[in-house]
Swiss-Prot record:
Family statement drawn from the similarity comment of this UniProt entry: Belongs to the quinolinate synthase family. Type 3 subfamily.
Keywords, comma-separated and alphabetical: 4Fe-4S, Cytoplasm, Iron, Iron-sulfur, Metal-binding, Pyridine nucleotide biosynthesis, Transferase
Any Gene Ontology CC annotation: cytosol
Name recorded for this polypeptide: Quinolinate synthase
Organism superkingdom: Bacteria
EC numbers: 2.5.1.72
Catalytic activity: iminosuccinate + dihydroxyacetone phosphate = quinolinate + phosphate + 2 H2O + H(+)
Length: 366
């Protein structure tokens, strides 16, 4: 999402904020019923509880990408997630389908840490250092422009659900990979595949330089210096506190956490894995969960027979995900009902052409 898109969006009328929860729920329910199969609402796990009940599908990034690619019926897809997810949905759906984002301010700080101009500046420098030995791999939490560059250069997208499989494949294609924008997912995945930390370098996009003290020939993974502002806040101290105060508690974290945190946790995995593992656990088990607060709260509600806490007791929700709320959802649905275009996400054909190559490689491998 760029600044112009944010400025150009319509501002939601204030009367939506003045409506009661009961009124909004009734209106959303009514419009959903009227639109029927012409409307599809995918919803990410990190969304607010007030939005989730209206979802036609709930999932992680991989699940929602797969669902978007399979859905050919709905004319309108109202994406309850963040901007890069809506872009992905637009590229994977038909040209007749319209993807909208209820609030255009719902971006992703991690995705914004990898700018296409920074990437096009980095690539020739890396080619000079390593020659034609690098395959770019981008986390799905990236802009369409980044995905397009990666697709054009033979690379693929990846999610936290399929990271091990995709990165393993990528390392079979070229001698080394360039993983962006999340250094932690890249580091944790590569380490799980047996690559030592000393064989991983950092690419600093601000300085436009490689940060690596070893022999270049030993470098197998180049990590873009980006991170998730939510998962960065889970710390080793959080884990030590759980071990001290709740010795029977099992710790499961998202692989966007730092390597130190992931290494000390009992398990790590995508939001889908976290949800599935806890839901399937025996009654009475105890869990500390290192991921976004909305999801942790929902897991607690859905598992009253278990003791579940956030790994970080002072954790906040993802603030950009939180911009999608019931008033914005209703505002968007009423626009669709009235035949108005609002907050449509449309990726240009040239960008889509190569971004689809990266997305389709991932979906085929998944």
């Amino acid at each position: 999402m760029n600044l112009l898109e944010t400025v150009e969006q319509d501002t939601m009328p204030t009367h939506y904020k003045q409506m009661t929860q009961v009124e909004m729920i009734a209106r959303v329910t009514e419009i959903k019923a009227q639109l029927g199969e012409n409307l599809f609402i995918p919803c990410h796990h990190y969304q607010k509880d007030e939005v989730v009940p209206f979802a036609d599908a709930i999932g992680d990034s991989l699940q929602l990408a797969q669902i978007a690619a399979q859905n050919k019926k709905a004319k309108h897809i109202v994406f309850c997630g963040v901007h890069f997810m809506a872009e992905t949905a637009d590229m994977l759906t038909t040209s007749e389908q319209i993807v909208t984002l209820p609030d255009m301010r719902a971006g992703c700080s991690m995705a914004d840490m990898a700018d296409i101009h920074q990437l096009t500046n980095a690539w020739p420098k890396l080619q000079t250092l390593f020659g034609d030995t690098i395959l770019p791999v981008t986390y799905i939490n990236s802009t369409a422009a980044i995905k397009s560059f990666v697709g054009e250069h033979g690379g693929t997208t990846v999610t936290s659900s399929n990271a091990t499989k995709i990165v393993s494949w990528a390392l079979e294609q070229k001698e080394r990979i360039f993983f962006l924008p999340d250094q932690h997912l890249g580091r944790n995945t590569a380490f799980e595949l047996g690559i030592p930390l000393e064989h991983m370098a950092i690419w600093n996009p601000i300085k436009n330089e490689l940060e690596y003290e070893g022999n270049l020939d030993d470098c197998k993974v180049i990590l873009w210096k980006g991170y998730c502002s939510v998962h960065q806040h889970f710390t080793v101290k959080n884990i030590e506190n759980i071990r001290k105060n709740h010795p029977n508690m099992r710790i499961i974290v998202h692989p966007e956490c730092t390597h130190e945190v992931v290494s000390l946790a009992d398990d790590s995995g995508s939001t889908k894995k976290i949800v599935t593992e806890i839901n399937n656990a025996a009654p009475g088990t105890e869990w500390a969960v290192g991921t976004e607060a909305n999801l942790v709260g929902r897991i607690i509600q859905e598992n009253p027979d278990k003791k579940i806490v956030s790994l970080n007791p002072f954790m906040c929700p993802c603030m950009t995900m939180n911009r999608i709320d019931l008033p914005h959802l209703l505002w968007t649905l009423e626009a669709i009902q009235n035949g108005e275009k609002r907050n449509q996400i449309k990726v240009d054909e040239q960008t889509t052409k190569f971004a689809l190559k990266a997305l389709e490689r991932m979906l085929q491998l998944s």
